[in-house]
């Protein structure tokens, strides 16, 4: 299937079958049924060790990471005007005509640009979203030909936004390092040379949102993800393997911080890798901007501290590139097994119907 854009499909009365998920994967909680279980942590006073705020912030982050692997931060130092401008420009990009957005399509292995939905290898349902990706750090990784030229001001604003998020990411890594009982700079050192990828998600309104997902259930592979979401709602989290879900309460100007697989392994499993998904709705489009703070490909992945009585959750040290490959292989294997099981179930149901039909014909004869 090659839709022009998801925005175009949003005008249909029924959901295209390529986006329909199995019943057990469909949303269990509404996009706006908000929960206050994810803590909102003020970073005010973080840079001033004299007032005792830093240890208190560390304690709150420890609890959040042990419970969910997710927390929200306010008083983070990112200018509200920059946040508003980044959000405005992002919405203006997705409002462009399809042919202008498709000038930056990522087909053919292009690195960065505009993507219409995604489907995991082995999966059989697509995500209800469009997104733009750009790689901003290290700076020599930037390919400005893949950064949209419209709307005006996109490049200059995204450069500033990326720079400010790098600073915030560095602060958060220091606090997380202390929260793990390490020296302030240990987590940053373990990343070797921090990479940054920014992914801007746009979720158009959906004709049948109860049948699909904006983004399938997953964990992020990197160290941390810093997410800016609008006030619509749709980010959901689980901590019991997907049995129950909560919708994260949007907070004006806040950033949601997710711990990724890399951070989970470095903490020796003490801190959860945030298990999350995104749902959509039929009344309001939604925008979120995810900034992935990832280690270098050659960074070594192994617990930085193993507490007394614990065992390492990894058998041996591996590189981040190897860890990423293993995680993706596992996701693909799970999706493939599920797809094959579904196909077998459908075949069995078809065979039963054929048997019933044959039996009915014999009775009539």
Swiss-Prot record:
GO cellular component: cytoplasm
Catalytic activity annotation: a flavanone + 2-oxoglutarate + O2 = a flavone + succinate + CO2 + H2O
Broad enzyme group: oxidoreductase
Gene Ontology molecular function: flavone synthase activity; L-ascorbic acid binding; metal ion binding
Binding sites annotated in the UniProt record for Fe cation: 76, 218, 220, 276
Signal peptide (from-to): none
UniProt-listed Pfam families: 2OG-FeII_Oxy (PF03171), DIOX_N (PF14226)
Biological pathway: Secondary metabolite biosynthesis; flavonoid biosynthesis
Subcellular locations according to the entry: Cytoplasm
Cofactor dependency: Fe cation; L-ascorbate
Keyword 4Fe-4S appears in the UniProt entry: no
Residue stretches making up the Fe2OG dioxygenase domain: 194-295
Keyword vocabulary terms for this entry: Cytoplasm, Flavonoid biosynthesis, Iron, Metal-binding, Oxidoreductase, Vitamin C
Keyword Signal among record annotations: no
Known EC number: 1.14.20.5
Positions of the UniProt region annotated as Disordered: 345-365
Protein purpose: Involved in the conversion of naringenin to apigenin. Acts via a direct 2,3-desaturation of flavanones instead of a sequential hydroxylation/dehydratation mechanism.
Family designation: Belongs to the iron/ascorbate-dependent oxidoreductase family.
Protein name according to UniProt: Flavone synthase
Annotated organism of origin: Petroselinum crispum
Lineage: Eukaryota, Viridiplantae, Streptophyta, Embryophyta, Tracheophyta
């Amino acid at each position: 299937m090659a839709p022009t854009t998801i925005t175009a499909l949003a005008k249909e009365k029924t959901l295209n079958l390529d986006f329909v998920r199995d019943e057990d994967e469909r949303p269990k909680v509404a996009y706006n049924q908000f929960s206050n279980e994810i803590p909102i942590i003020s970073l005010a006073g973080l840079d001033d060790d004299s007032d005792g705020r830093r240890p208190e912030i560390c304690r709150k982050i420890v609890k959040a990471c042990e419970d969910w692997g997710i927390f929200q931060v306010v008083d983070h130092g990112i200018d509200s005007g920059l946040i508003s401008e980044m959000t405005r420009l992002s919405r203006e990009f997705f409002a462009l005509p399809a042919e202008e957005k498709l000038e930056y399509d990522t087909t053919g292995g292009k690195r960065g640009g505009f993507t219409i939905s995604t489907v995991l290898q082995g999966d059989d349902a697509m995500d209800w979203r469009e997104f733009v990706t750009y790689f901003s750090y290290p700076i020599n990784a930037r390919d400005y030909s893949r950064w949209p030229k419209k709307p005006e001001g996109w490049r200059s604003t995204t450069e500033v936004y990326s720079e400010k998020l790098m600073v915030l990411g560095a602060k958060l890594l220091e606090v997380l390092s202390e929260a793990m009982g390490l020296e302030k700079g240990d987590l940053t050192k373990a990343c070797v040379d921090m990479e940054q990828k920014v992914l801007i998600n746009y979720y158009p309104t959906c004709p049948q949102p109860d049948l699909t997902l904006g983004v399938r259930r997953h964990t992020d592979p990197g160290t941390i993800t810093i997410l800016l979401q609008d006030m619509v709602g749709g980010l959901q989290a689980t901590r019991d393997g997907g049995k129950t879900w909560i919708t994260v309460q949007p907070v004006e100007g806040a950033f949601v911080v997710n711990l990724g697989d890399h951070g989970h392994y470095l903490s020796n499993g003490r801190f959860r890798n945030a298990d999350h998904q995104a749902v959509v709705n039929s009344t309001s489009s939604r925008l979120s901007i995810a900034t992935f703070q990832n280690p270098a490909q050659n960074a070594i992945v192994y617990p930085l501290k193993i507490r007394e009585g614990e065992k390492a959750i990894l058998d041996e040290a591996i590189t981040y590139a190897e860890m990423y490959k293993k995680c993706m292989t596992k996701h693909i294997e799970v999706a493939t097994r599920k797809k094959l099981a579904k196909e077998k179930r459908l075949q069995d149901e078809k065979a039963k119907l054929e048997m019933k039909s044959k039996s009915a014909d014999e009775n009539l004869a």
